[in-house]
Amino acid sequence: MAEQLEVVIITGMSGAGKTVAVQSFEDLGYFVIDNMIPSVATKFVDAVKQSGEITRMAMVMDSRSRGFYDQVVPCVAQLRGRSDLTLRLLFLEATDEELVSRYKESRRAHPLSHQDGVLPGIMRERQLLNDLKSQADLVVDTTTLTPRQLKQRITERFSPDEAHSFYVNVMSFGFKYGLPLDADLVIDVRFLPNPYYIPDLKYQTGNDPAVQAYVMDNPLAQNFYQHLYSLIEVALPGYIKEGKSSLTIAIGCTGGQHRSVTIANRLAADLKNNQYPVHVHHRDVDKAN
C-alpha cells in the first residue's frame, strides 16, 4: 500500500516569514512549491500522488496569486475532505507595526497597498484572511522571532519524526508590550509579588535562580501554580482527543522579565517531565527594564 501523502499549505500575512518557511520545509525534505494557485492545487496534488515519488509536500498560497481570496478557502476544504492525504495549514502572522517595519526595511510594495501606503494594505489583507486563519492547524506569530527561531518552530512541528505528535508551546510575555497573537491560553500572573522592586533582583530575570526562588517561595505563588498545573494537566488530554496538534500557553506579567518567565520555565519543565514535547519562548525577556 502506498504511503499516504502529507500536504502542508503555508499561508498568512505578507511579510510574516513565508520565505523562511519555504527554506525550512526544503531542509526537512519536503517537496516545496512557492506561489501555488489555489484553483490548480488539487490537480497538482493528483499529479504528485500519481508519480509515487513524493510523500511530503508543502505549497505556499498567498495574495500574489490572482483570485487567491476567493479560491483558497474552497481549496482547503476540498483537500481536507480527501481520504488519500493528510492536510495541515500553517498560518504565519505578525503585528501591523512589525509588518510595516519589515516592508520599510525591504523597500518592497505590499501586494494590497495602493496610493494610501503600506498599513492600509496590511489591514485589508488581515481582514480578508480571517476565515482562512480560523482553519489553520498552527498559527505562528513571527513578530519577535528571528529567522532561526522561526525555522526551529517549524522543524519542531513538521519534521517527519514529530509529524503526528501533540506539541506544547509555553511562552512568557509582558502585557505592556501587547498580547501574543497566537496564544490559545493566556495566564495573568501580575498579582504575584514583583521582583522588579527588589534592588538585587531588578536587573535579573526569571531565568536566574534568585528570581525563581523569590517568586516560587511565596505561598501565594505555590498555591496558584499547583492549581494552574492541575488545570493544564486535566485540559491537555482533552485538546489531544479533539485533534488539536499544538497548544500555546502564554504566561504574562507586566514587563515579561521576572514572574512570567519564572512560571513559564516551571510549567515547561513539569510538562517535559510528564513526557509532553515542549518549546519555551520568552518573548520580552531581553527588553530593557
UniProtKB/Swiss-Prot annotation:
Keyword GTP-binding: yes
Xref: Pfam families: PapZ_C (PF22740), RapZ-like_N (PF03668)
Ligand binding (ATP): G12, M13, S14, G15, A16, G17, K18, T19
Residues reported in the UniProt entry to bind GTP: D62, S63, R64, S65
Keywords annotated in UniProt: ATP-binding, GTP-binding, Nucleotide-binding
Entry superkingdom: Bacteria
GO molecular function: ATP binding; GTP binding
Key word ATP-binding present: yes
Leader sequence residues: none
Function text: Displays ATPase and GTPase activities.
Similarity comment: family membership: Belongs to the RapZ-like family.
Database matches in HAMAP family: RapZ_like
UniProt name for this protein: Nucleotide-binding protein LAF_0356
Naturally occurring in which organism (per UniProt): Limosilactobacillus fermentum (strain NBRC 3956 / LMG 18251)
